[in-house]
Amino acid sequence: MSEMYSAPVTVLGAGSYGTALAIALARNGHKTYLWGHQPEKMAVLATERMNNAFLPDIAFPDALEIESDLVQAIAKAKDILIVVPSHVFADVLKQIKPLLSAHHRIMWATKGLERNTGRLLQTVAQEILGNQYPLAVLSGPTFAKELAQGLPTAIALSSTDSQFADEMQQRIHCAKAFRVYLNNDMIGVQLGGAIKNVIAIGAGISDGMGFGANARTALITRGLAEISRLGASLGANANTFMGMAGLGDLVLTCTDNQSRNRRFGLMLGQGKSAEEAMAEIGQVVEGFYNTKEAYLLAQTQGVEMPIVEQIYQMLFCGKNAHDVATSLLGRERKGE
C-alpha cells in the first residue's frame, strides 16, 4: 500500500456511525484516530477496545486509536472525517478551525441541514472555513452495525477536489465489503442524505397506523419525487437521486427498523408523542430536526413537498396522524 493511501485519518464523532466508519478505515490497514467530546467515555473506549454503548461486541482493529485531545486528533492526520449530529456540525467546525493547517482536508458523513436555516452543510463549512480546504461528503445506505460487522455495504462520495475524492475512494473502498462510488454532485448527495430521514418518519407513521406495504411504497415513491424536485431547484443532478445517496438511502431508511427515523415514525403512528418516542430511542433522530429545515428550504425554493409539509404539521403544529393521512390522500387528483 502506498504511503499516500496509508496516511492516517482522524474521525470526529464517536457515536455509532463515527465508530463504524473508524473501524472500517482501520480494518483496511489505515491508522485511524477516533475522537469524541466526552473524555471520560473515550477513556472507556480506549480501555475496552470497543464501543459497548453503540456497537457492543465489535472489537476495534489494532490500527484504531482513541484520541480524547482534539488538538492532538487534528494534528495527527491531514484528513479529517466529521461524523456528528447535524445540529452540532457548525460548532465542531468552529472548534477545529484554529487547529487546521494548509494541508488539511475535510470530509463529513453527517446527514442533515443546518438548524433553523435549512442550508446545506457544504455551505456551512465554506462559510466557517473559507474555500482553502478540499471538502468531501460521504453518504448512502449504511447502518452502522452492519458496516462495523464488515457486511457488504455501498456508499457515494462527492468532493470539491477530484484528487481528494480519488484518494479517499481508494482508502475507504474494500473489495470484500465496502464499495465506494464517486459522484460529482455534492448538492444532490447532501440533499438525498438529509431529506430521506423526513420521508422515513412518514413511512414509519404509515406502518405504525397499520396502513400496510402499499402505502409505504407510495410514500417512498412520492417522497423520492419530492426530494428530486427540491434537488432540481438547487441545481442537483437528477441521476444522483436514483443512486446510493438518493433511492438507496431512502429505501433502506424507510424499510428497516435499524433506522431511528423509521422507528420514531412507528411510535408516532402508534400514538406516542415525539418526546416519548425520542426518549425511548435514546439517540439523535436527525429527521425530527431536519423536518423543520426541509420544510423551510422547500418554502424558500418555492417547491411543493406535501409529504414533508404534513410531517412538519404533525411534529411542530399539533396535527394528528389521522388528519395527516386524510390530507395526503385527499389531495387534488393529478398526473404522476
From Swiss-Prot:
The active site is at 196 (proton acceptor). GO terms for biological process: carbohydrate metabolic process; glycerol-3-phosphate biosynthetic process; glycerol-3-phosphate catabolic process; glycerophospholipid biosynthetic process. It is found in: Cytoplasm. Pathway: Membrane lipid metabolism; glycerophospholipid metabolism. It catalyses: sn-glycerol 3-phosphate + NAD(+) = dihydroxyacetone phosphate + NADH + H(+); sn-glycerol 3-phosphate + NADP(+) = dihydroxyacetone phosphate + NADPH + H(+). The gene is gpsA. Its EC number is 1.1.1.94. Belongs to the NAD-dependent glycerol-3-phosphate dehydrogenase family. This is Glycerol-3-phosphate dehydrogenase [NAD(P)+]. Sn-glycerol 3-phosphate binds at residues 111, 140, 142, 196, 249, 259-261. It is an enzyme of class 1 (oxidoreductase). Catalyzes the reduction of the glycolytic intermediate dihydroxyacetone phosphate (DHAP) to sn-glycerol 3-phosphate (G3P), the key precursor for phospholipid synthesis. Pfam families: NAD_Gly3P_dh_C, NAD_Gly3P_dh_N. NADPH binds at residues 16-17, 37, 111, 144, 260, 284, 286. One of its GO terms (cellular component) is cytosol. The keyword Lipid metabolism applies. PROSITE patterns: NAD_G3PDH.
